[in-house]
């Protein structure tokens, strides 16, 4: 497996993997009608077309995990300026559903933490996860994250689901176990 920065040419593949991850993980949080309808893919394509455009703010990092054949198997997106009062935001960490449990999430999180620490050494790394996404909650607990806040999601398709904000303090950014 290799880790490489994303380019504009990766937008469609990242959008497709993002949606595959949502479909495997967010049933019961997002409606099936949304997840299975054309709006979800259009939503993800618009997001990644924008994030990977050349005029997107330079302070962002989208890291791709590719298998030995070059297929996209995971990605992480760090947005340092998205929530400056909370810390450096890890906005996305997704692994292809068929590749979960192989250490890819751990490697992506470790790489995201290293990049965040280099950009903003005095800021914590933070992320939001749906409380009902039990496998992700367990993963972040194992990775040493601490729940520091709860909120009702502002995502209109989340139906008022609760999100947990996890944080890793800046002084405590050792390699992920």
Q: Where do the PLM segments sit?
A:
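Extreme N-terminal starter segment of soluble prokaryotic enzymes
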Residues: 1-3
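Acetyl-CoA-dependent GNAT
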Residues: 5-8, 16-100, 106-119, 150-153, ...
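Acidic/polar helix N-cap motif
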Residues: 7-10, 133
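Hydrophobic beta-strand residues of extracellular immunoglobulin-like
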Residues: 61-64, 127, 164
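Conserved beta-strand-loop-alpha-helix junction that forms the acyl-donor binding cleft
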Residues: 100, 126-137, 153-161
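Conserved GNAT acetyl-CoA-binding A-motif
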Residues: 116-128
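Conserved acetyl-CoA-binding loop of GNAT-fold acetyltransferases
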Residues: 141-149
């Amino acid at each position: 497996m290799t880790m490489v920065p994303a380019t504009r040419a990766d937008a469609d593949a990242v959008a497709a993997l993002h949606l595959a991850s949502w479909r495997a993980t967010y049933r019961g949080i997002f409606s099936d009608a949304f997840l299975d309808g054309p709006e979800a893919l259009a939503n993800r394509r618009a997001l990644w077309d924008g994030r990977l455009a050349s005029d997107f703010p330079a302070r962002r990092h989208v890291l791709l995990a590719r298998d030995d054949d070059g297929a996209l198997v995971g990605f992480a997106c760090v947005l340092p300026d998205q929530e400056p009062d909370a810390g450096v935001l890890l906005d996305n960490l997704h692994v292809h559903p068929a590749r979960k449990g192989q250490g890819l999430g751990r490697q992506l999180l470790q790489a995201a933490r290293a990049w965040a620490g280099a950009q903003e050494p005095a800021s914590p790394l933070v992320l939001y996860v749906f409380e009902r996404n039990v496998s992700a909650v367990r993963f972040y607990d194992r990775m040493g994250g601490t729940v520091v806040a709860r909120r009702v999601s502002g995502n209109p398709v989340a139906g008022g689901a609760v999100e947990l904000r996890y944080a890793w303090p800046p002084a405590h950014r050792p390699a992920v176990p």
